[in-house]
Amino acid sequence: MAVQKEATLVRQIIRAAGGHAADVRELVAEHGPEAVTAVLVDEIVSRAPHPVNDVPVLVELAVRSGDALVPRRLAVAQGAPVRRAAPDDDGFVAMRVEYELDELVRELFGPCRERAAGTRGTTLFPYATSGTGHIDTYFLAAQQATATVLAGCTSAKPDLNELTSRYLTPKWGSLHWFTPHYDRHFREYRNEEVRVLEIGIGGYQHPEWGGGSLRMWKHFFHRGLIYGLDIEDKSHAEEQRITTVVGDQNDPGCLTELAARYGPFDIVIDDGSHINEHVRTSFHALFPHVRPGGLYVIEDLWTAYWPGFGGDSDPGKSDLTSLGLVKSLVDSLQHQELPEDSGRSPGYADRHVVGLHVYHNLAFIEKGVNSEGGIPGWIPRDFDALVAASSGGAA
Ligand SMILES: C[S@@+](CC[C@H](N)C(=O)[O-])C[C@H]1O[C@@H](n2cnc3c(N)ncnc32)[C@H](O)[C@@H]1O
């Protein structure tokens, strides 16, 4: 298993942002406003949508901490992502947005707050400083560019469908229609410091493709750490809060090592090879490393029917397929109801699968403690006997 670099300061910032205001102050005192601001600007740049202003402008983000003011300029123009302006960039500064550092830390990395007003100061600069042009042109550019930057300064819940287009992941809109299901099952984890592992970063053997879904999860889980496993080197997809690992999802040793290093995971998503044997190996190796209350997700169940992926076109012969695994989990969920002489000794999945949601090509498996106890042995296992026992002698 080859491992790429790992984040540290951002993890401390996320932790402090979920705590008391004093925790953020202590962290800033320890690391200094410049270092903390650098992490925040990285995050804002990655969350900001594509600019729409065709007149390029600069937006100054001024971050205040006590007497210190850390100004950072962002270049905003249609056709390129928002980026940090070069020190010698003498473009037109259209707007200054000023935040208190602790406020911005909590806005970006704290539990989500819907309040949008009263969190920042703004200064709209006169268009005349740009030298030429008409006031309407610059006013519009300033407005659009500021809106773009401010959209990166929030942790409000994004629209997953929109994020699939922005970050280029095929989880919605062409082959797959997964995002509404993801939104339904993942939204309750958004305010948590989740660790999400996705098997399959994307792009297969292309050296620069892939990483779209990791970026989407990074944006959606604004307090999360995102890990991607791929058989190919996908280190180009690394960024703040995204770690990539090279390894084979069909190698239990590799998966155990990965989980020991980065787990337990709140969510694991299998979007890797979709070879049936691999899907089963990964589930058995990684499900024990999902924390109670977490989710294990399997995409692309269609390969269960295709021999080219080790599947079988006969649904009755699913013993070795991904769908066979999913179907077997229904029995795991209900195992406490089996007759005592069934000969089944409860396995790990029996003891820990507490919910199963199956959609077209997609399954969500809920982890927990599956020991509510079966229907007691003294309850009749025969309909007529049950009616008689339940009718107070009237039957
Ligand atoms: C469908 S793509 C992943 C797409 C990505 N999750 C997204 O939504 O944008 C599948 C990826 O799985 C990787 N893969 C194939 N076999 C694998 C294996 N045995 N172990 C780990 N990754 C594998 C491929 O290299 C490819 O990049």
From Swiss-Prot:
Gene3D superfamilies from the xrefs? 3.30.1050.30, Vaccinia Virus protein VP39
The reaction(s) annotated as catalysed by this protein in its Swiss-Prot or TrEMBL entry are: demethylmacrocin + S-adenosyl-L-methionine = macrocin + S-adenosyl-L-homocysteine + H(+)
Which keywords does this Swiss-Prot/TrEMBL entry list?
Antibiotic biosynthesis, Methyltransferase, S-adenosyl-L-methionine, Transferase
> Record's superkingdom?
Bacteria
Give the Pfam families listed for this entry.
Answer: MycE_N (PF17843)
Question: Organism classification, top ranks?
Answer: Bacteria, Bacillati, Actinomycetota, Actinomycetes, Kitasatosporales
Q: What does this protein do?
A: O-methyltransferase that catalyzes the conversion of demethylmacrocin to macrocin, the penultimate step of tylosin antibiotic biosynthesis. Also able to mediate the conversion of demethyllactenocin to lactenocin.
Q: Which InterPro entries does this one have? A: MycE_N, SAM-dependent_MTases_sf
- Gene Ontology molecular function: demethylmacrocin O-methyltransferase activity
Question: Which BP terms in the Gene Ontology apply to this protein?
Answer: antibiotic biosynthetic process; methylation
Its UniProt pathway annotation is: Antibiotic biosynthesis; tylosin biosynthesis
Q: What happens when the gene is disrupted?
A: No production of demethylmacrocin.
What is stated about pH in the biophysicochemical properties? Answer: Optimum pH is 7.8-8.5.
Protein EC: 2.1.1.102
The protein's name in its UniProt record = Demethylmacrocin O-methyltransferase
